[in-house]
């Protein structure tokens, strides 16, 4: 990657984030007398991604997203003997050992799980906790979850903003339903938030589900 021009496409759901990042890069490039065009932003839907993936002038494709997307990108790039880097279907865990600093554990787990409303590819989805400290960690984390303020992300007093769209809300609800069906125990109740300020239907409560290994 180093030394090459970068052409990148953000998610079609967050084009303005892409524009903001590109503007930051442009400022850095200008301050360091770098030529324009080293980093090029293109926005659009999946068809733009398909165009980049099939273009033989692009020797390396790096893609972050679902495993379904990765299969398509990987096989398409391989057909033209290109190279691909795929980061797919994150299911990240934090392992908590008996000698862990529980204060740092709770802060790190909370931010890892609910930061950006759990929508980063590096979001924490699981905690694997040693039985000797399990109840203590569970109680501390549950207490922290119950103190979260959920609302407009432009209000700095809030900790958690909305999910990106209704599809994400449905995926969240289906995950809770599936967990219950498989024997999961709800520790901190989730659900869609209603009322003034939550009219979009995309604000949800972060949920903790207990599962025996």
Task: Write out the residue ranges for each language-model feature.
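Conserved small-residue-rich beta-alpha loop and adjacent elements
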Residues: 1-32, 81, 103
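Short beta->alpha connector loops at strand-helix junctions that form conserved
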Residues: 4, 9-11, 43, 64, ...
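Short alpha-helical
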Residues: 13-16, 46-48, 67-68, 79
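Positions that flank functional sites
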Residues: 14-15, 44, 92, 194
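Short Asp/Glu-rich motifs
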Residues: 17-19, 48, 96, 198-199
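ALDH superfamily catalytic-core signature
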Residues: 27, 54, 60, 68-213
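Short acidic capping loops at alpha-helix termini that bridge into adjacent secondary structure
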Residues: 35-39
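A structured beta-alpha segment of the ubiquitous adenosine-cofactor-binding alpha/beta core
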Residues: 40-62
């Amino acid at each position: 990657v180093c030394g090459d021009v970068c052409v990148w496409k953000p998610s079609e759901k967050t084009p303005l984030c892409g524009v903001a990042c590109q503007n930051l890069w442009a400022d850095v490039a200008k301050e360091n007398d770098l030529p324009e065009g080293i980093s090029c932003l293109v926005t659009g839907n999946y068809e733009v991604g398909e165009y980049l993936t099939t273009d033989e002038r692009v020797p390396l494709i790096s893609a972050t997203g679902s495993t379904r997307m990765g299969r398509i990108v990987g096989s398409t790039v391989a057909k033209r003997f290109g190279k691909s880097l795929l980061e797919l279907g994150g299911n990240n865990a934090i392992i908590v050992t008996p000698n862990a600093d529980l204060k740092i554990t709770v802060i790190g787990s909370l931010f890892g799980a609910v930061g950006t409303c759990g929508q980063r590819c590096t979001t924490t989805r699981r905690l694997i906790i040693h039985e000797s400290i399990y109840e203590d960690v569970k109680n501390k984390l549950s207490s922290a979850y119950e103190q979260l303020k959920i609302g407009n992300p432009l209000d700095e007093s809030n900790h958690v903003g909305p999910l990106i769209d209704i599809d994400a809300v449905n995926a969240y609800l289906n995950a809770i339903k599936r967990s219950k069906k498989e024997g999961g125990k709800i520790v901190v109740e989730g659900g869609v938030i209603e009322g003034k300020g939550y009219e979009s239907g995309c604000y949800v409560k972060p949920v903790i589900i207990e599962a025996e290994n």
